[in-house]
């Protein structure tokens, strides 16, 4: 068996634990089965009161670069300055403890205690992301040149995310309204 790449396994771990946390919070969620093109980039589908309507959840997983920040996702490039990055109804940002993310070796040492969850409605996720990317693009490099946004990790200060930490009730409230 080939060795697991952390860049891939962290994303899969984030999706799996978000699925579990939904059910732990009474939210009936299901995997999209890799059919993301049919589900606006979503990883999970949530049942609502109306069997014809579903909520979509996108999961983004990573380790924050700084203790007081929350990792959102990688920037695709200048195209992220225009339009919306996220299309799902909610984005769950799963942040791994940075030390444990680097040191674990798929031996069971990575646990729920090493994870933080930020449950963010689409409009808020897009606003937070856009604000950070716009500021990064406007900030010149030391040599005065323009910063390249492609593949840049996007973080926000943790204090901007406090209202979203473990906010599973937001999904439940939206589910019951629908």
Question: Predicted regions: what is each one?
Answer:
Residues 1-40, 45-178:
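Mixed-charge (Asp/Glu-Lys/Arg
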